[in-house]
Design a protein with these regions (language model features):
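Short, well-ordered surface patches within globular domains
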Residues: 1
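Surface-exposed recognition segments
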Residues: 5-13, 17-18, 22, 28-110
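Asp-box/BNR beta-propeller blade signature and adjacent active/binding-site loops
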Residues: 106-249
């Protein structure tokens, strides 16, 4: 039972009460979500036979669900994601004995986004007079063909400075604040620029609500990103995750 509750109650774990699917597996759409061995990553634009996913990543695939799981996420074709360190009442696993495919795993797409690593001289930019300027909008719609998801509700920003002089802003983009479609996007105001860049994907755990984001520069060369990750939708059972960057984000 996947009702989102702050205090989950014990439920029956009895299985195999309905017929199995074509592969002889019971309860693929009637019990808890189940871990898959695959690392989560984007689909590639070509046919594959016996795909085994990616060789690495930050989250692994889960599938399935139970009563009160929205049908969109309950479909066997739907791939959710979950951090390997996470655990909660909505996800379990099973052992299936079969020959492992010989297909080679995919490599994660290379991020070619370039950020300056030259340390900014803050003292050279010091001013002693008041500065007045119009606000700079940091939430822009992404390019249509960029592949960056962008929803109608963009909210809860966090912002910090980078050692290279850039400003980094992040926020969540979603249709509903309780939604599982939520992603965290980022934009950068590069040193000397007067316009924030188009948004990029900053953090995504597919089909998990990601309410709660913070950024911090520790003044010793490290940026900290703290973010909540839900068991499903809503924001009642969030765990806190931490990532660091030593290359200006």
């Amino acid at each position: 039972n996947q009702v989102i509750a702050a205090t989950p109650k014990p439920l029956s774990l009895k299985v195999a009460q309905t017929p199995p699917n074509e592969w002889g597996l019971y309860d693929m759409c009637g019990n808890v979500e189940e871990w898959c061995l695959d690392w989560y990553g984007p689909y590639i634009d070509k046919e594959q036979t016996d795909p085994v996913g990616y060789s690495d990543g930050i989250a692994r695939v889960t599938r399935g669900g139970s009563h009160n799981t929205p049908v969109k996420y309950l479909r066997s074709a739907n791939r959710m994601a979950m951090l390997p360190e996470d655990k909660h009442t909505m996800t379990g696993f099973r052992v299936v004995q079969a020959e492992y495919p010989q297909t080679a795993p995919l490599s994660q797409p290379k991020d070619e986004y370039v950020v300056s690593q030259i340390k900014w001289d803050w003292n050279s930019q010091c001013v002693t007079e008041p500065v007045f300027a119009a606000p700079l909008v940091y939430v822009h719609e992404p390019d249509v063909h960029s592949g960056t998801p962008f929803f109608k509700h963009n909210h809860q920003p966090a912002l910090t400075w980078c050692d290279n002089g850039d400003l980094l802003a992040v926020w969540f983009s979603t249709n509903e604040e309780k939604g599982r479609e939520m992603v965290v996007l980022s934009s950068r105001l590069r040193a000397g620029s007067c316009e924030w860049e188009k948004p990029r994907m900053f953090y995504q755990i597919a089909d998990r609500n990601l309410t709660g984001t913070a950024l911090l520069n520790d003044r010793q060369g490290t940026l900290y990103h703290i973010n909540g990750v839900e068991a499903a939708g809503h924001w009642q059972n969030l765990m806190m995750t931490l990532r660091t960057s030593t290359d200006n984000g």
